[in-house]
């Protein structure tokens, strides 16, 4: 399906099958992003089945967490987006079983795209990963 043909998600809370945030997706992460100031934020405790190397959260799971919270940062600005490009820099291993904090903010809004930045830190504030994404604006949605 082409991005321009994607159906709108007018009420994101009614979409419950998303791998990142869907509460009715038993295989997903079931993230619960919330708005705090001009950022989207979320906490997550990775379980053993989220690991790559023993005791370390798999990089794909970290990508998914950052991607999801960055999309919510755009959504909280009233923009329904899909990720066009994303870059992640891993700084430290994210430990399984510990609370992780994901945050993201919109850095720039353009005509067709949004630039978003995200980061993952542990409880001590140690930077574990940081990301930048270009997201394609599908359509404006109701502000949350």
Predicted regions and their residues:
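Short histidine-centered catalytic/ligand-binding loop motif
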Residues: 46-60
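Hydrophobic residues in beta-strands and at strand termini
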Residues: 44-46, 90, 137
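HotDog/MaoC-like acyl-thioester-processing domains
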Residues: 1-11, 94-96, 106-144
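Hydrophobic beta-strand-centered segment that forms part of the acyl-chain substrate-binding groove
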Residues: 69-101, 106, 132
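Non-catalytic linker/capping segments at the edges of enzyme domains
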Residues: 1-43, 47-48
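Active-site helix/loop of acyl-thioester processing domains in fatty-acid/polyketide metabolism
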Residues: 34-39, 57-81
